[in-house]
């Protein structure tokens, strides 16, 4: 309705915001947007002794001593039960595009990640997938979406990169740069 999003999108869609905050979850978009901690402005917490604390403020910057708010984030319920949250939302990017970069093996895929991050592409997410996962998914769904042999070469691992933004042309420019980087770092079929 307001075209806003909560960036630390947890992979588990049945998860709660309280659980998300209790574990300081990051989700796939943490690469670009950070983790839950970056989006919690305030919370109400019930301590084990029954005391109710109102922590934080509905503004981003505060400097009034220790941050009990940030101590609660990621404490997994050991310090108290979160009953209310005030979260920061950001404008939802209008466009996104995802790429699967296949590599010969796990080492090649893993070594590609820092190069992609350092290229200034500002990826929304970078995910690693082993060949076994791709094969298992294809067997389970009966649909082989991701190729395992590219130009006669076996892919042993994959990197899934998502780029997002508000300007489609700018995203396509970053996508071209990603394809060039893919060629330089040994990705198949970029």
Region annotations inferred by a language model:
Residues 1-190:
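Noncatalytic alpha-helical scaffold of FAD-dependent oxidoreductases
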């Amino acid at each position: 309705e307001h075209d806003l999003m909560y960036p630390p999108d947890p992979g588990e869609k049945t998860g709660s915001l309280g659980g998300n905050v209790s574990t300081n979850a990051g989700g796939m978009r943490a690469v670009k947007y950070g983790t839950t901690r970056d989006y919690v402005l305030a919370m109400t917490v019930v301590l084990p002794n029954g005391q109710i604390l109102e922590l934080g403020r509905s503004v981003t910057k505060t400097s009034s001593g220790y941050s009990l708010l940030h101590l609660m984030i990621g404490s997994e319920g050991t310090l108290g039960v979160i009953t209310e949250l005030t979260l920061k939302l950001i404008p939802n990017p209008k466009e996104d595009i995802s790429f699967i970069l296949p590599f010969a093996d796990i080492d090649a895929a893993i070594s590609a990640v820092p190069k992609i991050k350092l290229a200034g592409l500002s990826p929304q997410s970078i995910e690693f997938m082993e060949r076994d996962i791709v094969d298992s998914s294809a067997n389970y769904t009966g649909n082989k979406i991701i190729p395992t042999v590219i130009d006669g070469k076996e892919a042993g691992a994959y990197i899934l990169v998502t780029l997002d933004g508000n300007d489609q042309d700018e995203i396509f420019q970053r996508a071209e740069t990603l394809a060039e980087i893919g060629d330089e770092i040994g990705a198949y079929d970029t």
